[in-house]
């Protein structure tokens, strides 16, 4: 089960699966030269996010002390129309985890700078199918050749009951994740115009839209990402390694509220509990976990 969830984070990372029931991508306008097709999908996508998880103790290993985590993410993408509803999307993303607390030899930060290259089928700003590569450096401090990874994902959504229930299946992988390749998927159920279930990992959610501008999500989230470390010398004899791969993960659940009345921006604030934080040095068989702790999040997204 843990392997499936870890891999599914690559399958759907960076997406918020939503199904729009309208099927028209373009609208007709009359201009001086006749009828013109107007593209209804956004072409520029911007996102910035910060998440802070408060301090907690390391589970089962008191010599490692305690720690907290701060996550920051920035991304920008541009969609290029190919034909019909097919787009090529290209962009960049910078992510960074910072860890504070006891000086225990574990990484005090992990970061990645990578590109986005995707072929997508887009309806009303949501990708219903896609293939994406995210090549880049996934590292602690030093960018070396063995810090380069190419996470990839492929997915497709399809109706199970017209305008009501949709299925999502996918496959994803990366050189430094564990396992290297694994499946993912889930269901999306539209209860009404205002409420739906997005049962798709890594962000399953119950979503309520009281108005066009406000959205409330009861959401789970599974974050798994692998990095090349530098020197990791801890008080534990079993965890003294150099140039090792670590798969860091945070599993959490909480509530978040979004407001999109200031077009083209969407502002989101959230809070809840991070149930699991773990440093998994899976190639040497060592995984160190922290106790649960509260988290807080704020993000800003724009589509134009």
Question: Residues of each region from the PLM?
Answer:
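Solvent-exposed loop/turn segments connecting transmembrane beta-strands
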Residues: 63-68, 107-109, 140-147, 172-181, ...
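Residue-level signature of outer-membrane beta-barrel architecture
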Residues: 76-80, 119-121, 158-160, 173, ...
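Repeated loop/turn-to-beta-strand initiation elements of outer-membrane beta-barrel proteins
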Residues: 82-88, 125-131, 163-168, 194-197, ...
């Amino acid at each position: 089960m843990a392997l499936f969830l870890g891999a599914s984070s690559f399958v759907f990372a960076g997406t918020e699966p939503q199904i729009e029931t309208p099927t028209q991508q373009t609208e007709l306008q009359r201009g001086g030269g006749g009828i013109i097709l107007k593209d209804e999908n956004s072409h520029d996508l911007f996102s910035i996010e910060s998440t802070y998880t408060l301090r907690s103790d390391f589970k089962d290993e008191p010599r490692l002390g305690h720690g907290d985590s701060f996550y920051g993410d920035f991304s920008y993408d541009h969609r290029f129309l190919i034909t019909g509803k097919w787009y090529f999307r290209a962009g960049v993303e910078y992510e960074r985890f910072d860890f504070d607390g006891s000086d225990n030899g574990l990484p005090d930060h992990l970061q990645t700078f990578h590109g986005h290259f995707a072929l997508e089928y887009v309806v009303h700003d949501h990708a219903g199918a896609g293939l994406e590569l995210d090549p880049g450096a996934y590292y602690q401090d030093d960018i070396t050749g063995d810090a380069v990874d190419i996470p990839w994902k492929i997915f497709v959504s399809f109706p199970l009951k017209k305008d009501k229930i949709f299925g999502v299946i996918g496959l994803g992988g990366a050189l430094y994740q564990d396992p290297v390749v694994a499946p993912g998927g889930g269901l999306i159920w539209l209860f009404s115009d205002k409420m739906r279930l997005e049962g798709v990992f890594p962000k399953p959610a119950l979503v309520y839209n009281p108005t066009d501008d406000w959205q409330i999500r009861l959401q789970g989230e599974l974050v798994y990402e692998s990095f090349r470390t530098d020197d990791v010398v801890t008080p534990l004899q079993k965890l003294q390694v150099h140039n090792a791969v670590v798969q860091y993960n945070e599993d959490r659940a909480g509530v978040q509220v979004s407001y999109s009345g200031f077009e083209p921006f969407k502002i989101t604030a959230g809070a809840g509990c991070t149930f699991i934080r773990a440093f998994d040095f899976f190639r040497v068989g060592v995984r160190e976990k922290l106790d649960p702790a509260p988290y807080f999040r704020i993000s800003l997204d724009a589509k134009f």
